[in-house]
A protein has these predicted regions:
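GST superfamily/GST-like fold recognition
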Residues: 143-169
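Conserved small/polar residues in nucleotide/adenosyl-binding loops
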Residues: 171-175
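A generic membrane alpha-helix/interface feature
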Residues: 43, 117, 164-165, 170
Length: 175
């Protein structure tokens, strides 16, 4: 395979990238990394020492949304970002908002060093954000309407892990 994804099997950010690669029907290799005993080369490839990391020949990318946008541009079918620049910019803004409003709390829950108090606050914040999001998406097939998009991919791994995180199970929020 020409692409290698360094990934944590339970890491929601890695799962986003796996999702996109499978959605594109790509030939790629997954190298699962033990998130608590990372090999040294992870720090060489990503100065933040985090997965996912995508390697394709001389290109090394990290940060799930950046990796996924690259894959989407490189292999345009099926297209996961809107073709229109205005809609694409709106989608990027929504992805950014998801990171700031929801996924910063996911980082807290994924981090073993987080205090119990921080975890409780993170769970509440995630619950509040998803509850706020629910009415907007309740009548749509996907987050952006009828089209499956990068936003669905960004959010899906969180929804899969809600029970694990100890947040309320959102039976009405189906992806």
């Amino acid at each position: 395979p020409m692409m290698v994804l360094y990934s944590g099997s339970t890491d929601p950010f890695s799962q986003r990238c796996r999702f996109v690669l499978f959605e594109k029907g790509m030939d790629f290799e997954i190298r699962d990394i033990d998130l608590y005993h990372k090999p040294e080369d992870i720090n060489v490839m990503n100065p933040y020492g985090e997965v996912p990391i995508l390697v394709e020949r001389d290109l090394v990318l990290y940060e799930s949304n950046i990796i996924n946008e690259y894959i989407d541009e490189r292999f345009p079918h099926p297209q996961l970002m809107p073709p229109d620049p205005v809609e694409r910019a709106r989608t990027r803004l929504l992805l950014f908002n998801l990171e700031r409003e929801i996924f910063k709390h996911v980082h807290t829950l994924e981090n073993r060093a987080s205090s119990d108090e921080a975890r409780v606050k993170a769970r509440e914040a995630i619950r509040d954000q998803l509850t706020g999001l629910a009415p907007a998406v309740a009548k749509k097939k996907y987050l952006m309407g009828d089209e499956f998009s990068m936003l669905d991919i960004a959010l899906a791994p969180l929804l899969w892990r809600l029970n694990y995180y100890g947040t309320v199970s959102y039976t009405h929020l189906t992806l």
